[in-house]
Amino acid sequence: HLSIRRQRQMCIRDRLYIMYTSGTTGKPKGIVRENGGNAVALCYAMRHIYGMQAGDVWWGISDVGWVVGHSLIVYGPLMSGCTTVFYEGKPIRTPDASAYWRVVEQYQVNALFCAPTAMRAIRKEDPEGELIRNHDLSSLRQLFLAGEKLDSSTHEWLERVSGKPVHDHWWQTETGWPVTAPCVGLEGSAAKPGSSNRAVPGYHVRVLDDEGHLLGANHQGSIVIALPLPPGCSQTLWGDHERYLQALSLIHISEPTRLRRI
């Protein structure tokens, strides 16, 4: 029997969880997520980025130990009134490459999120999409991929065999929710293979050269986000606030603007 306890009010700035990430260099960082900002960001993301409504069925395919699991298996869908599918297993050989499609059909999934690696593995086992045709995917509206580069070939293959829109988008543990995404719940932007779409409302994304000068289109540089950061982004590192502050750079572009290098 479950014991029912009185709910306890929390301040919006109270810590919700701490998640360690190694990043690409340096020692691991304890990302601190706050209650209020996380709730605001994820409710916005579920509705406006992923196009989900209360009563919809969402499937975030990840491990709860990663930020995708926290944001898009637990907090985001449940706060938005969605059913969330929790799945443990490989995309192939359980027993075959139709495992994902079987779950979509069985639970009437409306949208799913996974890493490109999973779809590349499915493609390798079922290049012509023969197994996918054995399942009813009429409930599925969108597929979202992130976590690594989604190559154009896999993007185009997945759209062809599934008959559904495929969207690449980008974010990371420090932000807790998407930085660039299609925003299908708003007007959205057409899926473009090789693109992770435009900046989500609230993020002011810039690309700078090594000297901190603003770059235009079709140039490679460092991606930065102008302050203030939107709700949901980490505001400190556990036990190492000085290190967090060191990552906040004062860079002058057309006018003095504080930027967060990511």
Roles of regions detected by a PLM:
Residues 1-8, 12-14, 251-262:
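Single conserved hydrophobic/aromatic residue that forms the stacking wall/gate
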